[in-house]
Amino acid sequence: MALAIRSSLRAAAMGRKAFRQAVPVRVAPAQRVRSVTTASAEITAYSVEEKGPKDSLEYRMFFKQGAKEVSCWHEIPLYAGDGHLHYICEIPKETSAKMEVATDEPRTPIKQDVKKGKLRFYPYNINWNYGMLPQTWEDPGHTDATLGAAGDNDPVDVVEIGAAAAKRGGVYKVKPVGVLAMIDDGELDWKVIAISADDPKAALCNDVEDVEKHFPGEIQKVLEWFRDYKIPDGKPANKFGYDNKCMNKEFTLNVIKETHEAYVKLKSGARANSEELSLI
């Protein structure tokens, strides 16, 4: 009897083993992780935090590096290596809200410009990504010997002509290729022409003549846009130095170098902060 029971149990065990071998074990499929493609020119080490209602006088966009709040003007380096610069997008292409880095507020957040208590907008969309070069400053105490105009007390502006729309508050690598010397109400307001490092045409554009070849007529469009945008508000057209010419890359890099040096003097205290800008 005992022998029969043991034989029966042995047979049952062999049956279960055979069943496990015959039926494959089901493994739950790996969970899909949706990847997000980020432009290689975007510097993802920085993030932004928005405070206050959008489209309001209280709205501010602050920058963070990890958990730490940082100033996009002071703590993001100007030079990115390999001939590239960092720039901060304030106004994405095909938008009209006049956003700017608030250089007189702690941590220099992005805010919308205000005039007579009202938020400012361009009369029409800007057709390029527009922003600023960190760690640069156009010194209002320095008059350009050739142009006879002093700096406008702001970081240097960037007009990024690439195909893709940037995002407000994005930090990107760009290649500078030229510069326009805009004179706005008697103040010198350099407009650096640049292209995003990951634009399909970036490798082809290394100087002004390359831009004219691969983006024919684009620099003239930039000049005309900035020349005329105040006219709908009843103001005169802006002027440009050097006979409206876009200066070459060598000249551009010298402008960037000089405005970076002016910034360093301001930040270090070698130049008095008589404009009461925020240096934190």
From Swiss-Prot:
- UniProt subcellular location: Plastid, Chloroplast
UniProt pH dependence? Optimum pH is 7.5.
Ligand binding (diphosphate): 120
Task: Using the UniProt record, name the top-level EC class of this enzyme in a single word.
Answer: hydrolase
PTM annotation, UniProt: The N-terminus is blocked.
Where Mg(2+) 1 binds, per the record, is at: 152, 157, 189
| InterPro entries to which the protein is assigned, alphabetical | Pyrophosphatase, Pyrophosphatase_sf
User: CDD domains from the xrefs?
Assistant: pyrophosphatase (cd00412)
Annotated catalysed reactions: diphosphate + H2O = 2 phosphate + H(+)
Its Enzyme Commission number(s) read 3.6.1.1
Give a GO molecular function annotation for the protein: magnesium ion binding
What top-level branch of life does the organism fall under?
Answer: Eukaryota
The record describes its quaternary structure and partners as: Monomer.
- Entry protein name: Soluble inorganic pyrophosphatase 1, chloroplastic
Question: What is the native source organism of this protein?
Answer: Chlamydomonas reinhardtii (Chlamydomonas smithii)
Q: Which gene encodes it?
A: ppa1
